[in-house]
From Swiss-Prot:
Homodimer. The lineage of its organism: Bacteria, Bacillati, Bacillota, Bacilli, Lactobacillales. The keyword Nucleotidyltransferase does not apply. Pathway: Pyrimidine metabolism; UMP biosynthesis via de novo pathway; UMP from orotate: step 1/2. HAMAP family: PyrE. Belongs to the purine/pyrimidine phosphoribosyltransferase family. PyrE subfamily. It catalyses: orotidine 5'-phosphate + diphosphate = orotate + 5-phospho-alpha-D-ribose 1-diphosphate. One of its GO terms (biological process) is 'de novo' UMP biosynthetic process. Catalyzes the transfer of a ribosyl phosphate group from 5-phosphoribose 1-diphosphate to orotate, leading to the formation of orotidine monophosphate (OMP). GO terms for molecular function: magnesium ion binding; orotate phosphoribosyltransferase activity. Keywords: Glycosyltransferase, Magnesium, Pyrimidine biosynthesis, Transferase. This is Orotate phosphoribosyltransferase. 5-phospho-alpha-D-ribose 1-diphosphate binds at R96, K100, H102, E122, D123, L124, I125, S126, T127, G128, G129, S130. Orotate binds at S126.
Length: 209
């Protein structure tokens, strides 16, 4: 079983991911979605957490061997990033969504040196907007952002476009395609449900029609 499949299985088992193609969720953007993900739940399950953190370490070593600092996005990327940095014996920092409005007014907490090669950790990629904002903030502070590694992606076309335009490499440990395949195999969804989930990936607005 691949790492992507193992993680998809774990996310379903611990209910970090819910699939309701016949009774969709409403995202903050207003989009009706057949999937809801809360990867913060993974921190409460040691087996799942270890699988994810070890997957992060292996992926970073394979794709970004020159990394010098790990950064987590606030807030979801912070615990994962801190664990990864500890496992890799690397410095750690975290990136706020906006400048702090008191004290030193930092957006990056921790010490990042000019030109230091950084990998940013995120838990979930939808459109990628927030983590790309974090990458831009890190670059402004002088970091050399090598790429972003995340637990899971919805594989939305908008995300691919955004990362391409930003020139930032994205790697995820698991993905929507893998998850719905595992969900069907393990009986979480019906054939009709799988059909709707595939339609959502193709067209997030008209998938129910």
């Amino acid at each position: 079983m691949t790492l992507a499949s193992q993680i998809a299985t774990q996310l379903l088992d611990i209910k970090a991911v819910y699939l309701k193609p016949e009774d969709p969720f409403t995202w903050a953007s207003g989009i009706k979605s057949p999937i809801y993900t809360d990867n913060r739940v993974t921190l409460s399950y040691p087996k799942t957490r270890d699988l994810i953190e070890n997957g992060f370490v292996e992926t970073i070593r394979a794709h970004f061997p020159e990394v010098e600092v790990i950064a987590g996005t606030a807030t979801a990327g912070i615990p994962h990033g801190a664990i990864i940095a500890d496992k890799m014996t690397l410095p750690f920092a975290y990136i706020r969504s906006k400048l702090k409005d008191h004290g030193a007014g930092n957006q990056i907490e921790g010490r990042v040196l000019k030109g230091q090669k950084m990998v940013i950790i995120e838990d979930l990629i939808s459109t990628g907007g927030s983590v790309l904002d974090a990458a831009a903030a890190a670059s402004r502070e002088g970091a050399d952002v090598l790429g972003v590694v995340a637990i899971f992606t919805y594989e939305l076309p908008k995300a691919s476009q955004n990362f391409k335009e930003a020139g930032i490499k994205l790697i995820t440990l698991s993905n929507y395609t893998e998850l719905i395949a595992v969900a069907k195999l393990q009986g979480y969804i019906t054939n009709d449900g799988l059909h709707l989930l595939k339609k959502f990936k193709e067209d997030q607005v008209n998938w129910q029609q």
